[in-house]
């Protein structure tokens, strides 16, 4: 019996995110399941402006720090064996995975 699984991956490091997507793609191809994706979702940009001067006096100069959160969406239609193999994939700490069973 085929199950539908939606994986939502997010990370600040897009290289590691693509690495995990390739591992997932390889497992799905080996088991013969159907896969759609990875679909790139919009990148979220977090900006934090901070004053350079610690005492608040002097010229108002600012540092702007930015963090980007990259996201991918993968839909998989496969059997229980495929899902078990997906659970055993090594995923780095920087990559967050959300699994939704349909």
Swiss-Prot record:
GO terms for molecular function: structural constituent of ribosome; tRNA binding. Keywords: Ribonucleoprotein, Ribosomal protein. GO terms for cellular component: small ribosomal subunit. The keyword Ribosomal protein applies. Transmembrane segments: none annotated. It comes from the Archaea. Gene3D superfamilies: Ribosomal protein S10 domain (3.30.70.600). Residues 34-59 are annotated as: Disordered. Belongs to the universal ribosomal protein uS10 family. Part of the 30S ribosomal subunit. Involved in the binding of tRNA to the ribosomes. This is Small ribosomal subunit protein uS10. It comes from Methanopyrus kandleri (strain AV19 / DSM 6324 / JCM 9639 / NBRC 100938). The gene is rps10.
């Amino acid at each position: 019996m085929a199950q539908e699984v939606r994986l939502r991956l997010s990370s600040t490091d897009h290289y590691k995110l693509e690495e995990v997507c390739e591992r997932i793609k390889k497992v799905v191809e080996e088991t013969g399941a159907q896969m759609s994706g990875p679909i790139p979702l919009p990148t979220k940009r977090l900006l934090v402006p901070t004053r350079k001067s610690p005492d608040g006096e002097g010229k108002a100069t600012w540092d702007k720090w930015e963090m980007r959160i990259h996201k991918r969406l993968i839909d998989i239609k496969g059997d229980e064996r495929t899902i078990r193999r997906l659970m055993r994939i090594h995923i780095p700490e920087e990559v967050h995975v959300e699994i939704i069973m349909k």
